[in-house]
Amino acid sequence: MNIYFINPPFKAEYGKFSRESRSPAITKSGALYYPLWLIYAALYSSKQGHNVSFLDAPAKQLNEERSLNIIRKTDNEHSLFVLDTSTPSIKSDVAFAGKLKALYPHSFVVLV
């Protein structure tokens, strides 16, 4: 199975959004916590024999359009997308998931 793990974009124009911090927010200092739970899941899936892709959009301050372009450019036809979410960004995360589903209608999109 081809699985794409995504830390989705959120207000990239304002700075880096840290979902993993104690209080998820756009950081004033620019500090950014790694999306550890998403990385753990990606590593476990890889060890189980799945083809894994990973995108950390907030780390690169990617907006939705640039993130979707990167996803489209991968060679694999992904059957599962796993998106990291948080309460402050949930509306944006759901909208991004909807765009993924529109681009890949036969794939599953999971928000965690």
Regions found by a protein language model. Give the residues of each.
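A short, structured N-terminal alpha-helical element that caps or precedes a catalytic domain
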Residues: 1-112
